[in-house]
């Protein structure tokens, strides 16, 4: 799978924000402090500052976006997704929130949701090359997953039609191995061997099993 690009979202003192109260002023200060902490790599402390900013002024949008970004940098994907959704609820036409949420959805394999977010981002900024590239990659990733699922289903369908054929079981094993699904590959390879698959010389050089070649279980199956 290809990787996508999240927009750089780190807003310190948001100059376009007109505070109307001491609480709002304090929210701006907390957000700025959080932004500095992110730059220093102190993400947990930064998150606390962004959360404090939001508690002081729920309408202060930069803190919401920065909170999501900090969670993302900490690889706390679920928390980041929730924070980006909250940011979108607060400001539905924010480009960065939609783009970065799309990146996280793609990371989780939720390609339809990712594609929807990138399309929304492009409705907001139609000429943005980052979002357009992300959309292209998400669509390709979705296509690759669908192709993988179709190949696996085709192999297993043949196995269901020929449940005692070791060559068919072997083909299912190599299909799983090709896509890096180790446990399923070994399950079907063991089945093929029990059914009488004997071409061990080919098994040892079959490129589909390259990712399993150094695994002790593979060594055991290839050299009984």
Residue ranges, per PLM feature:
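Position-specific recognition of the canonical hydrophobic site in helix A of tetratricopeptide repeat
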Residues: 31, 38-39, 65, 69-72, ...
């Amino acid at each position: 799978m290809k990787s996508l690009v999240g927009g750089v979202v780190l807003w310190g003192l948001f100059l376009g924000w007109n505070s109307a109260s001491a609480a709002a002023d304090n929210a701006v200060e907390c957000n700025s402090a959080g932004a500095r902490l992110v730059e220093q790599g102190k993400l947990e402390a930064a998150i606390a500052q962004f959360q404090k900013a939001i508690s002081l002024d729920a309408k202060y949008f930069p803190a919401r976006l920065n909170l999501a970004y900090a969670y993302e940098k900490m690889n706390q994907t679920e928390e980041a997704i929730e924070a980006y959704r909250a940011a979108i609820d607060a400001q539905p036409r924010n480009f960065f929130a939609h783009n970065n949420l799309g990146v996280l959805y793609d990371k989780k394999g939720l390609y339809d949701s990712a594609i929807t977010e990138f399309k929304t981002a492009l409705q907001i900024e139609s000429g943005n090359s980052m979002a357009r590239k992300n959309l292209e990659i998400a669509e390709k990733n979705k296509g690759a997953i669908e192709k993988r699922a179709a190949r696996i289903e085709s192999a297993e369908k043949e196995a269901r039609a020929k449940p005692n054929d070791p060559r068919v079981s072997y083909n299912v094993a190599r299909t799983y191995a090709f896509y890096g699904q180790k446990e399923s590959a070994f399950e079907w390879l063991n089945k093929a061997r029990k059914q009488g698959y004997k071409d061990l010389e080919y098994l040892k050089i079959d490129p589909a099993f390259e990712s399993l070649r150094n695994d002790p279980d593979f060594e055991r199956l290839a050299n009984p």
